[in-house]
Amino acid sequence: MTVAEVLADARDRMGKAVEAVKEDFGSVRTGRANPALFQKVMVEYYGSPTPLGQLASMNNPEARTLIVTPYDKTALKEIEKALVNVPNLSATVGNDGEMVRLTLPELTEDRRKEFVKIVRGKAEEGRVSVRNIRRRSKDELDALKGEVGDDEVARGEKELESLTKTHTDQVDDALKRKETELLEV
């Protein structure tokens, strides 16, 4: 493996770690109904658990309302049951025979602060993941010292530090955006 390959691999894995953090942030509820919150809710469909995103289209006509329209109307009851059982949601779920209407309650200040703590924890997990990738990549670079010149390894380590800073900054930026979104009333 060359220094360039180690750096390319690190860049790719760090990028995936940042994307995973952003995806995790999407699963934390803000004051508005976001279809991304419910994409991975599992619905019992013909005996097997299926993600809601594969069974229905979702849109939000109002900030705190989500309309779930199943592609197959026979799945309506199962979708409603799955949405009622989503933990920590406390939403009103209604079925009118054609679609499921989900109305989210207004978030309290305490609940918002609780969600901010959760998001900060997810961000820290992302930063730790990026640092672990850096450590593994640095070990790979150290193993190359006998094969390539010390100068090239030193340049690689410098580039690796730059990559790490860039990706941890991306996690921090995503955290700031999510905190702002959460604390917005």
UniProtKB/Swiss-Prot annotation:
Role noted for this protein: Responsible for the release of ribosomes from messenger RNA at the termination of protein biosynthesis. May increase the efficiency of translation by recycling ribosomes from one round of translation to another.
Give the UniProt subcellular location, in the record's own words: Cytoplasm
Q: Where is this region: Disordered?
A: 147-167
Q: Got a GO cellular component term for this one? A: cytoplasm
Statement: the UniProt record of this protein carries the keyword Protein biosynthesis: yes
CDD domains cross-referenced by the UniProt entry: RRF
In Swiss-Prot or TrEMBL terms, this protein is called Ribosome-recycling factor
Q: What is its main location?
A: cytoplasm
Give the record's keywords alphabetically.
Cytoplasm, Protein biosynthesis
What family does the entry list? Belongs to the RRF family.
Q: Which InterPro entries match?
A: Ribosome_recyc_fac, Ribosome_recyc_fac_dom, RRF_sf
- Which is one Pfam family of this protein? RRF
The protein's organism comes out as Clavibacter michiganensis subsp. michiganensis (strain NCPPB 382)
SUPFAM superfamilies in the record, alphabetically? Ribosome recycling factor, RRF
